[in-house]
UniProtKB/Swiss-Prot annotation:
Gene: gcy-32
Activity modulation: May be regulated by molecular oxygen. Probably not activated by nitric oxide (NO).
Keywords carried by this UniProt record: cGMP biosynthesis, Coiled coil, Cytoplasm, GTP-binding, Heme, Iron, Lyase, Magnesium, Metal-binding, Nucleotide-binding
Annotated source species: Caenorhabditis elegans
Protein name: Soluble guanylate cyclase gcy-32
Note: There are two types of guanylate cyclases: soluble forms and membrane-associated receptor forms.
Record bears the keyword Metal-binding: yes
Segments forming a coiled coil: 396-432
GO molecular function: GTP binding; guanylate cyclase activity; heme binding; metal ion binding
Disrupted gene: phenotype observed: No response to varying levels of oxygen. Significantly reduced aggregation and bordering behaviors.
Tissue-level expression: Expressed in a small number of neurons, corresponding to URX, AQR and PQR neurons.
């Protein structure tokens, strides 16, 4: 169904029940907000039924009640958005309004929106007692409750009538159409007026329900006559049929679109035309039943193309076919079948019907497709004006469609941009401390400042020896495996990873948020890293990789450097000393400076072994210590893993020390790198 239906349902729910209720309807129906009511979009019937089912469930009313409520609101909403004058000008009474619903429906579908939708048909009958019988035909069974709502609201708002609408009968039948078989529902309503009779200024009763047939004198000049040729030129597209639906006469212009052999008296009309609307079998009785409907007939043949092809030689025809694409070839061989739109009128004899019509052409493009020009239509034919006016309307509709498409594209781009922004923010928060990243995203200026913190460097002493033994891909995989494990420990212990360069890893504790336990935290991180490195195998020694870690505590300067690629950098002697603690350390050992040792022991409890004095650049001989274990936390607490009571010791340090000692022993017994054969890199 057309998007206007969905939009009016949305308006109905929001106005009467609020935005929250409509949100519930969308959630239940599975529609994305903003995609459920695109005005010029055609939704499948299934989509519309799902939407109405959701409204019914959310409002706790039956679907029939929803449809009837919608029918009444449809009139209210349509009159609010600009259709008020048209609705009120259709007829002075309800019968005339209902008899013209077909033409109004056709105009909205085919002219205003150019949708070519499958709409219902209506026909009224007056009864002797002054009531109305409304016949409603539709290819969508079960929607007749909409009609009840529409008719009641029109009677009340337009004609100020209080009516009752009772279903007198409801039948369904299978109808064979050109596009296949479909089920058609026929519902008969009895309409009764409950309002007081109205009278005009002369005191005569005026019926707003049924039509009033006044008998006016007819002026006839018996000497006046019109020849068949004149009549055929005045109405160039008309035809007359008899009770057998056989052709009696036709207009002159039809010969330009239909072969002459078919336009002979006695030719069954079904050989010439197929009916598009109303969707009924094309016979005399059905035409009389739908005498008030708009009839759209389509020519079954296309003689213009046929004449063009017949006039060509076989060689010319073959050459033209070869130069055309598939669509153009189809157009040449099949042609455009002319459509006629007009009114069927039962003549006084009751034995003949005349079809008063015009070509159903609404744009210059269609006019050209039929090989026609404006001169093919009489000056009195309003179709000429319609084509010119509709040409401008089509331009406006095209602009509106483009605007809707642009708006939808803009919304999509906005959502995609938001996703990309979130990704960028996430990357920035990975590159910088979270608080610093948040300040940058908020547009705040980050001032460099001094902090008391603990810096750690670690590397893989055996890494350079492993490079010749591995492919580049294996080297990258090995580093990723190690750094992924180290990153996990850093995150668990609340320490900030500054950077990695080749096999070197740098982290800091106490920045940018100060904590008095910065040295204690960094010592725990170092122990956890030593443990995690055990699971990555050195391809040379076939033993676990041994880390070399150096830690130093002191004052450092930290700040954000760069704008395009911002980086959180650390400066000062503390960074230099921490780097030397690592470079002057030993594989499998965590070397701490005297200041890191003192800071760690202030808040934590650790076991250190003195290394003695080492010569540190710019500091001379400096006291250092090897960290062996924490007396406050077990390995399992540090790495946040459960202990296997059947395998592991309570603290875990025995396994760590044993693994390190074994790896050191094996590595020390290996020959120098230039004496070894190459080996493959393995990661466990």
């Amino acid at each position: 169904m057309f998007g206007f239906i969905h939009e009016s349902i949305r308006q109905l729910v929001i106005r009467n029940y609020g935005e929250d209720t409509w949100t519930q309807v969308l959630e239940r129906s599975g529609f994305e907000s903003g995609k459920e009511n695109i005005m010029n979009h055609y939704y499948s019937d299934t989509d519309t039924y799902v939407l109405v089912d959701s409204v019914s469930l959310v409002l706790k009313v039956t679907k029939d009640q929803v449809w009837e409520m919608y029918g009444g609101f449809l009139i209210t909403y349509s009159m609010e958005i600009g259709w008020d004058e048209l609705v009120r000008s259709m007829s002075p009474n309800l019968k005339g309004f209902l008899d013209n619903l077909d033409s109004l429906h056709y105009f909205i579908d085919h002219v205003v929106y150019k949708a070519n939708l499958r709409g219902p048909s209506f026909r009224c009958e007056e009864t002797p007692d002054g009531t109305l019988l409304l016949h409603y035909f539709t290819g969508r069974p079960g929607l007749y409750h909409i009609v009840k709502g529409v008719v009641k609201e029109v009677a009340k708002r337009v004609f100020d009538l209080d009516i009752t609408l009772v279903v007198q009968g409801r039948t369904q039948r299978s109808v064979h159409m050109n596009n296949g078989e479909r089920v058609e529902e026929h519902v008969v309503f009895l309409i009764n007026n409950l309002s007081e009779p109205r009278r005009d200024s002369e005191g005569s009763e005026v019926s707003l329900l049924t039509s009033t047939n006044a008998n006016f004198p007819t002026i006839v000049d018996d000497t006046l006559g019109i020849s068949l040729d004149d009549f055929s030129k005045a109405l160039p597209y008309h035809f007359v049929i008899d009770e057998s639906c056989k052709l009696v006469q036709c207009g002159s212009e039809l010969h330009n679109h239909i072969p002459n052999e078919l336009l002979q008296p006695g030719t069954p009309i079904l050989r010439i035309f197929e009916i598009n609307r109303p969707q009924i079998p094309l016979d005399f009785e059905n035409i009389c039943n739908f005498i008030n409907a708009v009839f759209v007939l389509q020519v079954k043949t296309s003689p213009l193309k046929k004449k063009h092809m017949d006039a060509m030689s076989q060689e010319e025809l073959k050459q033209e076919m070869e130069t055309l694409d598939e669509d153009a070839t189809n157009e040449l061989t099949q042609g455009h079948h002319l459509k006629l739109k007009g009114q069927m009128m039962l003549l006084a004899s009751k034995k003949h019907i005349i079809y008063l019509c015009s070509p159903y052409v609404t744009s210059i493009n269609e006019l050209m497709q039929y090989g026609m020009r404006l001169t093919a239509m009489p000056l009195h034919d309003a179709t000429r004006d319609l084509i010119l006016l509709n040409q401008q309307r089509l331009s406006d509709v095209e602009v509106n469609l483009q605007l809707e498409a642009n708006n939808e594209q803009l919304e999509t781009m906005t959502r995609e941009l938001e996703l990309e922004r979130q990704k960028t923010d996430s990357i920035l928060k990975d590159m910088l401390p979270r608080r610093i990243a948040q300040q940058l995203l908020s547009g705040e200026h980050i001032e460099a400042c001094e902090h008391e913190a603990t810096v750690m460097f670690c590397d893989l002493p055996a890494f350079q020896q492993a490079i010749p033994q591995c492919s580049p891909k294996d080297i990258v995989n090995m580093l990723n495996e190690i750094f992924r494990k180290l990153d996990r420990i850093v995150v668990i212990r609340g320490v900030y990873k500054v950077e990695t360069v080749s096999d070197s890893y740098m982290a800091v504790s106490g920045i940018p948020d100060y904590t008095p336990e910065h040295a204690e935290n960094m010592c725990h991180v170092a122990l956890g890293m030593m443990w995690e490195a055990r699971s990555v195998i050195d391809p040379v020694s076939k033993t676990p990789f041994l880390l070399r870690i150096g830690i130093h505590s002191g004052t450092i300067t930290a700040g954000v450097v760069g704008t395009v690629h911002p980086k959180y950098c650390l400066f000062g002697e503390t960074v230099t000393l921490a780097s030397q603690m690592e470079s002057l350390g030993m594989a499998g050992k965590i070397q701490c400076s005297k200041w890191a040792y003192q800071k760690a022991m202030e808040t934590g409890r650790f076991e250190f072994s003195p290394r003695g004095r080492i010569d540190v650049k710019q500091r001379g001989l400096t006291e250092t210590y090897f960290l062996t274990r924490s007396l406050k936390k077990s390995i399992w607490e540090i790495i946040d893993h459960d202990r296997d009571i059947n395998v592991n010791s309570i603290e875990g340090y025995e396994e760590l020390e044993t693994a390190i000692e074994n790896a050191v022993t094996i590595k020390s017994a290996l020959p120098r790198p230039d004496q070894r054969n190459s080996a493959a890199c393995s990661i466990s």
